[in-house]
């Protein structure tokens, strides 16, 4: 993996082209001398803002972006449900006025009644007798019928608009919202009418939907060459599930503006008594679909999420997050007793990233926190510290090093008994070696008392009855080498204990044994209490748990 930085460097300006007071005295002279100066640059921010909406397509994109960022599901109860009820009762009001006001006067509103209008006859207008009744025919069409005629047209237009809205909402709710899922690991045939069986061979070829978008010649080629498949290719199949997934906003809108109520109001004579079944219909449909069915889906989602959480906490997390600790012990025949403990995956985690160049060549890069960039990693020689690894206390990430205790390590010439590890168990929290098995409790426990043997700040090891100790009790004495192959003990002055103190571990500077007496010499003072408190051994522990 590689990170790239884009550095924008402005070109250097030469002294000849750099502006100076001697060359240019007035900015207006610059604009006059520049033939490429555009007058449009004088426009301010308002003209730039209006330029974004210069075309109708820009308005279309802007409106669609504003609509797309709205969370419509959160507005299902506040917008969709009231809006659907308003449209339903608006159509009820329109049908009520049509059946009780417009319908009785429909003949006067739609048919012309001037077939026998004598006032339009030129022959009859010559007589004075007919002139006195000429204004009576025109006065019959008063303002009331004009208003009814306009209302009739308005109600007809509202009915058409509400019908189109109801049809579009119903179609989008029932047929427009589907999600397709591919099922590859299902052995039996799923019992659902929304599941179709498809061949895996079709995944490598053009789908029918893609062929429909192609040209006429492309569709002909698909029908001729890709229409039939061999039986062998149809054996490998998968299932495709087409799931119906309407949104919450559309569901609330469909329930409140139901096509059932719309058809009922359209096909019956509406009176004030019709309002009662409409209200009952709205409440029952809301109670079944919104209050019961959607709540059932939410409850099933909660149960599935709880099952996944239980599986994650009981199976996945214990398998993925196992308590581990890295350790490195001395596996050489010298038996120096060197043990290194690290946090988990300290030695296996690498900061080197392997990438490939455009030509396909392998490239290894390492992140350098000092320069905040990636550098090419050079292959270095691997060094194995076989002996005297305490010379390198910070060789691997500054890990904690447990020094070799003479009271716990055996002589290079001695080997432990085969019965020394029969009574001890393995610690459940940290790795250990056969030479460094701590004293165990009767049962494994992760409490503070059970792990006190691994924490020197709480309690150091005291009079232990470990079977390992009785075999290695003479580690303090230097036996003569009979085979002339043994290696003398290394002086403990070569240990660097400064790092031990900084890491919170107790240490000691001089623990060289006395060959004659088998005791240890301390350079910290002659005080008995001071000597006891600084001793790292279990026999002289001053732990409060003792």
UniProtKB/Swiss-Prot annotation:
InterPro entries: Nur1/Mug154. GO terms for biological process: maintenance of rDNA; regulation of exit from mitosis. It is a multi-pass membrane protein. Residues 1-10, 25-35 have a biased composition (Basic and acidic residues). It is found in: Nucleus membrane. Its main location: nucleus. One of its GO terms (cellular component) is nuclear membrane. This is Nuclear rim protein 1. It comes from Kluyveromyces lactis (strain ATCC 8585 / CBS 2359 / DSM 70799 / NBRC 1267 / NRRL Y-1140 / WM37). The lineage of its organism: Eukaryota, Fungi, Dikarya, Ascomycota, Saccharomycotina. The gene is NUR1.
């Amino acid at each position: 993996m590689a990170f790239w930085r884009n550095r924008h460097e402005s070109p250097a300006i030469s002294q000849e082209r750099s502006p100076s007071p001697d060359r240019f005295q007035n900015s207006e002279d610059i604009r006059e001398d520049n033939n490429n100066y555009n007058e449009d640059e004088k426009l301010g921010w308002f003209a730039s803002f209006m330029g974004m909406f210069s075309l109708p397509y820009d308005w279309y994109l802007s409106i669609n972006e504003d609509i797309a960022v709205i969370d419509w599901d959160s507005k299902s109860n506040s917008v969709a449900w009231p809006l659907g009820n308003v449209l339903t009762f608006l159509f009820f009001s329109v049908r009520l006025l049509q059946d009780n006001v417009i319908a009785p006067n429909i003949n006067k509103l739609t048919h012309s009644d001037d077939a026998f209008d004598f006032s339009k006859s030129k022959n009859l207008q010559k007589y004075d007798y007919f002139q006195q009744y000429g204004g009576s025919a025109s006065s019959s069409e008063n303002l009331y019928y004009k208003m009814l005629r306009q209302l009739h047209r308005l109600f007809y237009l509202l009915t058409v608009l509400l019908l189109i809205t109801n049809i579009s909402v119903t179609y989008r709710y029932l047929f427009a919202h589907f999600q397709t899922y591919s099922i590859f690991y299902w052995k039996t045939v799923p019992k659902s009418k929304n599941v179709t069986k498809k061949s895996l061979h079709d995944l490598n070829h053009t789908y029918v939907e893609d062929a429909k978008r192609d040209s006429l010649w492309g569709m002909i080629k698909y029908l001729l060459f890709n229409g039939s498949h061999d039986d062998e290719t149809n054996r490998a199949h998968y299932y495709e599930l087409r799931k119906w997934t309407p949104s919450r906003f559309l569901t609330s809108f469909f329930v409140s503006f139901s096509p059932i109520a719309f058809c009922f109001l359209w096909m019956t004579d509406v009176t004030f008594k019709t309002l009662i079944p409409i209200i009952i219909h709205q409440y029952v449909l809301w109670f079944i679909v919104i209050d019961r069915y959607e709540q059932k889906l939410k409850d099933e989602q909660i149960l599935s999420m709880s099952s996944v959480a239980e599986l994650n906490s009981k199976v996945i997390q214990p398998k993925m997050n196992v308590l581990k600790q890295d350790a490195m012990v001395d596996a050489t025949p010298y038996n120096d007793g060197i043990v290194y403990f690290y946090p988990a995956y300290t030695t296996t985690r690498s900061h080197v990233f392997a990438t490939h160049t455009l030509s396909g060549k392998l490239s290894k890069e390492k992140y350098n926190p000092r320069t905040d960039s990636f550098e090419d990693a050079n292959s270095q020689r691997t060094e194995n510290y076989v002996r005297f690894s305490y010379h390198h206390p910070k060789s691997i990430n500054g890990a904690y090093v447990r020094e070799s205790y003479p009271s716990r390590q055996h002589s290079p010439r001695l080997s432990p008994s085969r019965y020394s590890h029969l009574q001890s168990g393995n610690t459940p929290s940290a790795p250990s070696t056969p030479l460094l098995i701590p004293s165990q409790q009767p049962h494994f426990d992760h409490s503070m008392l059970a792990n006190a043997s691994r924490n020197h700040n709480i309690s150091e090891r005291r009079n232990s009855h470990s079977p390992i100790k009785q075999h290695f009790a003479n580690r303090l004495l230097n036996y003569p080498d009979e085979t002339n192959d043994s290696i003398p003990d290394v002086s403990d002055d070569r240990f660097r204990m400064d790092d031990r103190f900084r890491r919170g571990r107790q240490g000691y500077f001089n623990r060289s044994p006395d060959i004659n007496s088998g005791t240890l010499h301390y350079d910290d003072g002659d005080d008995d209490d001071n000597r006891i408190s600084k001793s790292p051994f279990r026999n002289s522990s001053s732990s409060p748990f003792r």
